[in-house]
Amino acid sequence: NVLDLSRLEANMMKFQLQDCNVQEWCSELACLIQMRSEGSIHLELEADAGDATIHTDINRFTQMVSNMLLYPIECKKRRDVKMKLAYNTEAQNISCQIANSPLADPTFSSQKQFILQKTCHLFFEHFNGTFRIEEPNERGSVIYFTYPTK
């Protein structure tokens, strides 16, 4: 994680870019999160990506989004996370909102959490997207990101 952060900061990260159908990727994401969290994260995913395609390093993109959905430290407590993803044809991007994200939860404040947040920010910025964390409120901690479509 620290190495990824250093490479992103220096603009030295190597990417294996390919096209990815966002709706298909979303279908796989839910299973991946279930497996990696061993059932502790219950992901409620609303995806309306239509035929959106992104050009990205799909492994790193998946890693960044997984970091937003999974606990940044060892934790088996059940947690409901809600992710809404939509294709914005006018802006030519996908936009995503993740409510109750463990990565943005102050409970897990640590150097590792900071590094993961910074890495996500730099990754999305590198590909002309956005990444921001909203202060905790009644929905918990919310992360927003956008990523340009092809």
Give the label of every model feature segment.
Residues A10-F15, T53-T56:
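Conserved micro-motifs of the catalytic ATP-binding
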Residues F123-F124:
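Detector for a conserved hydrophobic position within an alpha-helical segment of the HATPase_c
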Residues Q16-N21, H42-A52, N88, S101:
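Conserved catalytic submotifs in the C-terminal HATPase_c
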Residues Q16-C31, T62:
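A conserved beta-strand-to-alpha-helix junction within the catalytic ATP-binding
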Residues N93-K118:
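Glycine-rich/acidic phosphate-handling loop/turn and adjacent ATP-lid/helix
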Residues R36-L45, V81:
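Short conserved segments within the C-terminal catalytic ATPase subdomain
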Residues D80-Q92, A99-N100:
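Short beta-strand/loop element within the Bergerat-fold HATPase_c
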Residues N128-E135:
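Glycine-rich ATP-binding loops of the HATPase_c
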